[in-house]
Amino acid sequence: MTLSPYLQEVAKRRTFAIISHPDAGKTTITEKVLLFGQAIQTAGTVKGRGSSQHAKSDWMEMEKQRGISITTSVMQFPYHDCLVNLLDTPGHEDFSEDTYRTLTAVDCCLMVIDAAKGVEDRTRKLMEVTRLRDTPILTFMNKLDRDIRDPMELLDEVENELKIGCAPITWPIGCGKLFKGVYHLYKDETYLYQTGKGHTIQEVRIVKGLNNPDLDAAVGEDLAQQLRDELELVQGASNEFDEELFLAGEITPVFFGTALGNFGVDHMLDGLVAWAPAPMPRQTDTRTVEASEERFTGFVFKIQANMDPKHRDRVAFMRVVSGKYEKGMKLRQVRTGKDVVISDALTFMAGDRSHVEEAYPGDILGLHNHGTIQIGDTFTQGEMMKFTGIPNFAPELFRRIRLKDPLKQKQLLKGLVQLSEEGAVQVFRPISNNDLIVGAVGVLQFDVVVARLKSEYNVEAIYESVNVATARWVESADAKKFEEFKRKNETQLALDGGDNLTYIAPTMVNLNLTQERYPDVQFRKTREH
């Protein structure tokens, strides 16, 4: 049975994001993935601040200065017979809710681990978010051109700490200065590593068969024998790859390589297009939407300001769930009930924009937004329903924002509300005073906000510490008890950017006591958009 042209397009799509701890090599791997997808001819590695060659996916001004990727950009490239959408996620020492939310818009994740360090804190946090939807995970053990930890130990650590089985697909031969290449367990082939070839795609020498004397000649007898011994152990002790368990998020195929040396990335990409799911169904408040449905649906997971420094516009990123987008199409924005004609949707290659004529499930569209689109908005061809599972996360860090020029209060509030709508920060306005408190998941968000207030809204602000430890969204079915709660806790209540009532607690102890005192009030850690 041949698929219809529409279903053929759907089947070709793979949409994934990369999760890693800062400095595990995520930006480098992004570069190399794009190189293999021939989206860029030479991978511009991220060098120090003075370098003129900036990595393709780090593109706001602050990112250029710091060498870190702050905004989640989207890159689409062809690979074999597939079209791959890679959603880049902020991965430096500080990241934001954008990173969490981007993981709700993909069908698969690539986890990049620094093989010298193993599982690190950020990787754990991001894996927890992928667990909300049992997202399938591929794993790339990076930096084999450095001295690494024992590979068996690394697999054990992933299994024990992240509670996911490991199925090695390739296995390393040596590491650091002695790194010779990897052996593919399922193809019975050894791929030999050459140094100094990191910027372009090279022909790799392949040795067929584990017992081929050419292998001993190529890597030396000692390493060849060590490989055979290790593989006996590996095949006895680790999981075999099973596609069903992978799709259920229970096991992860593991690849070894060095992104900087451009080695092993193609093996991982081959696995991604072969095994990662085509666009998946998604839940709404009324039903499940299948990617095979021909009527258009999509949801907004991120809003980015000022992608074009020459224009003060904002772009909403929408994941297509079903149906085909065509230029000039009329779509209903469910939250407002308004029909809008989308004539100029964009597709991206990190900051380079091009207009899209058509898009399919799994693709990401950029919609011009003049303040009318919010995170979590659903677009359909008329059906009134809302996609679920795109949450706001309670901030973990808080600062008070103060103006250098008190006359600019209005611009400040406008700027903060707009920044909160796009998820750059959350803003809270205490009911009992005129303070403005911003909440974030990571510290750098505060610097980003101050820098953007200045460059986009011409408002000079500084932030200072504030006595807030945590925040919870509050609601209650019992109107009378809720009124009493509000009356007695006025000094701890604030409205967020969307005017939702929030309890801001000075300490965790205070929060726990208040929750005990008011059992009829719900204190929520996440809030659906």
UniProtKB/Swiss-Prot annotation:
Compartments (UniProt record): Cytoplasm
Residues at which GTP binds: 20-27, 88-92, 142-145
Pfam families reported for this sequence: EF-G_D2, GTP_EFTU, RF3_C
Gene Ontology annotations of biological process type: regulation of translational termination
Main location: cytoplasm
Keyword list, A-Z: Cytoplasm, GTP-binding, Nucleotide-binding, Protein biosynthesis
SUPFAM superfamilies reported for this sequence: EF-G C-terminal domain-like (SSF54980), P-loop containing nucleoside triphosphate hydrolases (SSF52540), Translation proteins (SSF50447)
GO cellular component, one term: cytosol
Family label: Belongs to the TRAFAC class translation factor GTPase superfamily. Classic translation factor GTPase family. PrfC subfamily.
Protein name, entry field: Peptide chain release factor 3
Role noted for this protein: Increases the formation of ribosomal termination complexes and stimulates activities of RF-1 and RF-2. It binds guanine nucleotides and has strong preference for UGA stop codons. It may interact directly with the ribosome. The stimulation of RF-1 and RF-2 is significantly reduced by GTP and GDP, but not by GMP.
Annotated organism of origin: Salmonella typhi
GO molecular function terms attached to this record: GTP binding; GTPase activity; guanosine tetraphosphate binding; translation release factor activity, codon nonspecific; translation release factor activity, codon specific
Presence of keyword Nucleotide-binding: yes
Domain tr-type G, chain residue ranges per copy: 11-280
